[in-house]
Amino acid sequence: MAAITSWITDSGCKDHASLVSIAKLAEQAERYEDMAVAMKTIAEMGNELNNEERNLLSVAYKNVVGARRSSWRIMSSIAKKQAGTPLADQTDIYLKKVEEELTKICNDVLALLSKNLITEKIGAEAKIFYYKMMGDYYRYLAEVQEGEQNDKSTEAAEEAYQKATSLAEAELSVTHPIRLGLALNFSVFYYEIKNMPEKACSLAKAAFDAAITEVDSIKDETYKDSTLIMQLLRDNLTLWNSECETDS
């Protein structure tokens, strides 16, 4: 059974331009499942995605999985409160259903990345984008897993983030939004998944400090994205600072 269902699958549409148009319309209508299926169909056709199309794919799945991540957090909190009560079993069953949906979507994205999108022919920027995305979706899996499964997803996330980082440091400027977004998410991974606040702070601070020295050279078309991510890095550093100082 597919992780996401949509009328687009039944329509049999395989025209690249039409699918991109559908994805854009679906985004405006906030129908992210349709948006994800449209972009997945393009990727499975073997077409290399341009920058706009990569962003459409990312936004679609981020919203689809984001809804499940939010539901899982809420249900997980409710399950803890209801432990030992008559509603405990029912709550646990519902939590598992949300978890299964989230897991299927993440595995869907990871399969798409490894089988269709990360190829030898793509450029460095696309490869960094996809390895970052791979790290993100293994991180989302690790959030809901325990034991050996958690260990495997955590290791895979770190490996993907590290591959993206090595490429980004060689190929992208310190103010490039993809490089900054990667540093943001990698630092969140260390803070939330590996419980390493000092490492998280170090990574986030290095990215912010490097970017702030070059802020005047940011291109107009990426200025808004780059400065927004820099602000998010600074916000996290402010939030984490007390723990970093305690651990150091």
Curated annotation (Swiss-Prot):
It holds the Pfam family 14-3-3. InterPro entries: 14-3-3, 14-3-3_CS, 14-3-3_dom_sf, 14-3-3_domain. Gene3D superfamilies: 14-3-3 domain (1.20.190.20). SUPFAM superfamilies: 14-3-3 protein. CDD domains: 14-3-3 (cd08774). It comes from the Eukaryota. Belongs to the 14-3-3 family. This is 14-3-3 protein homolog 2.
